[in-house]
Amino acid sequence: MAILKIDAERLWRRIMELSEFTEPNRPWTRLAFGENHRRCREWVRAQMAEAGLSVGVDPGGNMIGTREGRRKGLPAIACGSHSDTVPNGGRFDGAAGLAAAVEIASALADNDVELDHSLEVIDFLAEEPNEFGTSCVGSRAVAGELT
């Protein structure tokens, strides 16, 4: 298979747009379960759909965009990050990884590339510590460690 080229402008646009979901007086604050996080996840869902992914939410609250592979039964290739931040967190914390994962799906779709394995782009729920005293909620759910 030839090396795929990503659309760097689209990737940068997605990173910048995602980073804009923040509290006006607390830059780069997108707390899990808050209004900014809810709106951000709606935007992420739309970006996943635009990239040709079918989007759903697993029992742990993770949003997962899936591009089906040619060979059923093979384990999925998973990539992604999280869309929440700590208060006054880094501008691109989570955003860059999530946007990059969506760009991988977009590049595959743009070039009509089919993989043997399914591709899953995951927005892990509540990875950062939050006001409920929890963190890594989504990834712990995937690992079977959420009790």
Give the positions of each predicted feature.
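Acidic/histidine-rich catalytic neighborhood of metal-dependent amide-processing enzymes
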Residues: 86, 96-147
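Short secondary-structure junction/hinge motifs that connect adjacent elements
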Residues: 25-43, 60-65
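Conserved hydrophobic/aromatic pocket- or pore-lining residues that grip, position, or stack substrates
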Residues: 18, 48, 121
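Alpha-helix capping and helix-loop boundary segments enriched in small/acidic/polar residues
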Residues: 6, 89-92, 130
